[in-house]
Amino acid sequence: NHKRVYRIYRELELNLRIKPRKRLVREKPVALAVPKQPNLCWSMDFMHDQLSDARSVRLFNVIDDFNREALCIEVDFSLPAGWVKRALEQVIAWRGKPTMIRCDNGPEYISKELKSWAKKEEIMLGYIQPGNPQQNAYIERFNRTVRYDWLGHYLFESLDELQTFATQWQWTYN
């Protein structure tokens, strides 16, 4: 191991060459600012929870950063990039197209499928820096509201029950 190699090098008074770590060059994150009007910037994120039978479920949340309006709360066991794309297309058909969508670096968001769809639709995907959820503060705050208002208080038996409750809460929240 590296400690033993280091010790032997020191005992033999050899010069130890320490390689510098290669750093990934990342793009600068988009600054978190309040948009001037609706539909300029949306934020999206996932949440995890369990049904009463301990099956893991995911919630996909989308909000408008201008007025924090909940645009979409979708629930399923697995939410791949194609599913995210379809959910966003439904919201766009209802609300119109945003200029930018802010998201984290999850596998669904960095997939080629979602990137090519966003490029085709002329929507910029703004990625936050890894390990800095505060750069996506609007959706993180919304996730906290979801968790403390209803998700942490109820046990749901099925996906249909959870989706129905989420949709009703979304209309009440807005």
Per-segment meaning from a language model:
Residues 1-174:
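Charged DNA-binding/catalytic regions of mobile-element recombinases
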